[in-house]
Amino acid sequence: MEGPGADGRGMTGARKARRSIALSLLYALSCVVAAVVLVISGFSYFVVKDVDSIGSSHAIVSGPSIGPQNILLMGLESRRDWAGNILPNYILKALHAGNAQAVANGAGGNDTNTLILIHIFAGGKKAVGFSIPRDDWVNFAGTLGPQQVGKIDQAYGVSLYYEEQKLKGQDPGLSQDQLAFQGNEAGRAAAVATVEQLTGVHIDHFAEVNLDGFYELARVLGGVEVCLNHPTSDVNSGANFPAGYQHLDPQQALAFVRQRDGLPNGDLDRTHRQQAFLDAVMQQLRTDGTLNDLTKVQALLSVARQYLITDAGWNLLNFASQMRTLTSANLVFRTLPIQGYETIDGQDANAVDPSAIQSIVHATFYPATRSAAPASVVGPGAKQPSPPVVIPSTGPQGGPVTAKNGIPCVN
């Protein structure tokens, strides 16, 4: 396996109420994981029998599924599936991620390339999400092994690796499935704890999807429409796009959300692309009749059943029932700020101020108590938060504010 820190349901949606649930939840839950959670939550409210088919995890103690809650969405960039099997060659090719032999020899990692923290306000009528840049340099929390600091996206892979090494030493006869299951559980616990420590808020639920799940989602949707401010080309991700409004097939969509090299703001621009991808999916579901097409709905739900993992205590039916009143006007995206760029241990990283981040997150999630310090900071030695700073503007950022058909242009 790779070393540490390497860099389902069915029903038509004919009624407007059902369509509104799905679209609103999609936008609120954001990016790759969000698209899958949306479909599950929106339709599972009407199709009770299919809820238990979603993969579940006991990595955290779940919070409530009704009322105010914090949800972490994780997109895992791994060349392996949940059982530890190497991804099919057609997906590796689409990812520009080498081949099966390279993965078997240790290529790739288990980084959380997408981390989005969502707060659902009481009553479910309002939601706000913070994208967490993957290169933020942080202290880890809940990780196994000697590495206790690094980029925030590495916390998952570090714990996964050392958990598997520990288990191999204890019982050399464990199967690949058993190692992968326990390793991923350790990774999830570490990723959640590290985000809690950085942001100072408790996470009630999480949802996780892998690269193969993203690819299959884009395939079922038939690709997405996006808009770029400038032409771009990157051999590492396979991105090669002209400027302007354009349709991306599934392979191109993967390159679009994975590119970081050659972008003016690197990983921050990639974060904005992930947000733009969400907008594109939302627009597509709104306009092309996907949610009224039983065949497409069943295909989307099949992707959810196969590729989505949520915490075992998240009652998606209760969650969906609360989200019925959410409108797109009450859904906002923001990106956690950075202080600048640094090279640490040979890695390009974002310098961050946890105290300032905690103040921003607390003031946004709990505005009625914004003068108070965050009460749920995780981890020893957490610093007293600085006074709140200006919150970044909403929506995908990083370029001229232009759009076509509701889809913003990004770098």
Residue ranges and their predicted role:
Residues 2-411:
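Non-catalytic, solvent-exposed segments at the cell envelope interface
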